[in-house]
């Protein structure tokens, strides 16, 4: 059934709609300075090829204006104790910067993109979205988007990028696009009776009761004083070779498991193999779009769900996968249960501001990797910089088609001020080791580990050895034997996902800190060999400027000018 009628016209003739429980929770999180940056969903696309910037601005503007959620304004109705929103506000106006003509340096543009990605929104006054088109040159353009999570989930991001693509092609051709007419987000939210919710909460609580509310991570925590508290994050990634991937997925298929379930099993197994815990609560995001009417609606329908995984001393990989499948199906069925109510029953001493029962999360990585405006203009998504994280550890799983076959890609997001990168890398290596054991010894007990091979040390003071090390990593990642030292990674067949893997492998092999932006600036084998000759300096956390575009532009140039 549809939700209760809107609260009607206010004295200013606005029509207000009740926010969902998830949106209300996000509105509360947005009031906390520490958690506020985690409520943003930034996307940066780098286009290579000719771009009609007038057409792109028109496409972005129309995409931002046509969806009610992206015009929303929020307020707290104190009398009803209800967060509510209206959708009759003006949409965000995309900005345009000709960085080449105005003499912006790469560093200044990077500063601006970081600021656009981190600056908060005033949910009461501003549209919960911003966009900037940045012309870098005749064949290079950036599109920086940022939308508040309160109106935008992972599915919405794909929809918005697709809208921009369709609208751009139509604008460039001088024709009207064919687009759907999405319903208002408030019209597709089902309202449930309190009695039904209470009964379902009781069932979930009964299923999860007794499991520890914490997960013991095998990662030493860095002691910090309160002034250093931050949720600035980083990501490490790896992927299994096609042969191992095929064997892993064949075993998973025998137990009816999806790639997501494989990720949960690998995480639980690795935690059990590296620590004393055997009973885990693991969070994951559920799309929440069971109603077909939500198919074309940009909005926040996602919910956080928790599943339970236990591991016995004699459980084989087949046993673990079967347990994960059953637990996952139970969690899917109860995905509409409010997590805050479950958390309150199981962990009354929790931080009420951030209620999930688990500090670890597993998600299927379905983010788009490319956005092609036209056949001659390709776009790839840049890695997030900055990245903000709410969980102690978030595992993302993706089954990727590559030229040499399907690869199971795994990435770990973590807070950089809490965990050392080397320790997280060790845990990622342990995840790979677990995957290899699953593929090779599925009938063996999970807690019976195979022997790990040792790596051969490389003399990083030897320029020839550094070059050969980087060449070997490129050959491994690109699946190519002939690697030129002076050709960029992307011209050699790399993409953004493989770049993330390259960052991880260079850091792992060299023992040096390697950053994604470093590889953009040193895209060749020879450049990266020089890069790992010395450890990279740690990047400073960017300060979140006010959301005003003029202030962001000025701040970006000020930072860049100070560095020159």
Task: Give short role names for the model-derived ranges.
Residues 1-30, 447-564:
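Regions immediately C-terminal to embedded phosphopantetheine-bearing carrier domains
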Residues 1-34, 57-105, 112, 125-127, ...:
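Short amphipathic alpha-helices and their capping loops
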Residues 14, 24-33, 42-50, 60-62, ...:
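Adenylate-forming
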Residues 14-31, 52, 106-112, 157-158, ...:
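AMP-binding/adenylate-forming domain of the ANL superfamily
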Residues 16-18, 134-184, 423-437:
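Active-site-proximal acidic secondary-structure segment that organizes catalysis
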Residues 20, 67, 131, 149, ...:
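Conserved small-residue
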Residues 59-66, 167, 171, 251, ...:
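Generic non-transmembrane alpha-helical segments
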Residues 69-75, 279-282, 516-517:
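Short, hydrophobic-rich beta-strand element in sensory/regulatory alpha-beta domains
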């Amino acid at each position: 059934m549809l939700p209760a009628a809107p609260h009607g016209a206010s004295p200013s003739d606005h029509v207000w709609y009740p926010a969902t429980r998830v949106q209300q929770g996000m509105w509360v999180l947005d009031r906390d300075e520490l958690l506020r940056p985690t409520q943003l969903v930034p996307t940066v696309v780098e286009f290579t090829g000719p771009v009609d910037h007038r057409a792109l601005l028109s496409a972005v503007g129309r995409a931002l204006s046509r969806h009610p959620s992206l015009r929303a304004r929020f307020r707290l109705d104190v009398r009803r104790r209800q967060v509510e929103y209206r959708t009759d506000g003006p949409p965000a106006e995309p900005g345009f910067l000709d960085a080449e003509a105005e003499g912006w340096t790469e560093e200044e543009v990077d500063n601006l993109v970081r600021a656009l990605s981190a600056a908060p929104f005033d949910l009461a006054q501003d549209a919960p979205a911003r966009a900037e088109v940045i012309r870098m040159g005749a064949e290079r353009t950036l599109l920086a988007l940022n939308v508040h999570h309160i109106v935008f989930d992972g599915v919405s991001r794909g929809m918005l990028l697709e809208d921009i693509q369709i609208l751009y092609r139509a604008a460039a051709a001088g024709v009207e696009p064919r687009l759907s007419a999405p319903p208002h987000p408030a019209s597709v939210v089902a309202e449930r009776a309190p009695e039904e919710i209470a009964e379902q909460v009781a069932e979930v609580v009964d299923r999860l009761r007794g499991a520890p509310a914490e997960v013991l991570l095998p990662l030493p925590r860095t002691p910090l004083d309160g002034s250093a508290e931050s949720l600035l994050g980083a990501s490490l990634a790896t992927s299994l070779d096609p042969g191992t991937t095929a064997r892993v997925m064949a075993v998973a298929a025998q137990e009816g498991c999806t790639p997501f379930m494989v990720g949960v099993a690998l995480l639980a197994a690795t935690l059990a193999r590296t620590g004393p815990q055997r009973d885990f609560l693991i969070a994951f995001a559920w799309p929440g779009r069971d109603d077909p009417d939500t198919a074309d609606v940009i909005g926040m329908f996602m919910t956080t769900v928790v599943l339970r995984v236990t591991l016995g001393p004699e459980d084989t990989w087949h046993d673990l996968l079967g347990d994960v499948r059953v637990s996952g199906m139970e969690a899917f069925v109860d995905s509409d249960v409010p997590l805050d109510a479950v958390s309150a029953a199981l962990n009354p001493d929790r931080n009420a501001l951030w209620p999930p029962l688990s500090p670890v999360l597993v998600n299927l990585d379905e983010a788009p990797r490319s956005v092609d405006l036209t056949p001659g203009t390709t776009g790839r998504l840049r890695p997030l910089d900055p990245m903000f994280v709410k969980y102690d550890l978030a595992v993302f799983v993706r089954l990727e088609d590559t030229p040499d076959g399907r690869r199971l890609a795994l990435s770990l997001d973590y807070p950089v001020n809490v965990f050392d990168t080397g320790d997280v890398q060790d845990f990622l290596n342990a995840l790979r080791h677990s995957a290899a054991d699953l593929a090779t010894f599925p009938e063996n007990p999970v807690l019976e580990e195979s022997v790990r091979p040792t790596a051969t040390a490389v003399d990083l003071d030897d320029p020839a050895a550094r070059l050969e090390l980087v060449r070997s990593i490129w050959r491994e990642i690109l699946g190519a034997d002939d690697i030129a030292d002076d050709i960029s990674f992307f011209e050699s067949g790399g993409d953004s996902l493989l770049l993330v893997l390259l960052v991880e492998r260079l850091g792992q092999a060299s023992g040096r800190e390697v950053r994604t932006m470093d590889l953009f600036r040193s895209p060749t084998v020879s450049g990266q060999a020089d890069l790992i000759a010395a450890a990279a300096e740690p990047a400073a956390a960017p300060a979140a400027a006010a959301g005003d575009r003029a202030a962001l532009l000025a701040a970006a140039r000020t930072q860049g000018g100070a560095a020159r």
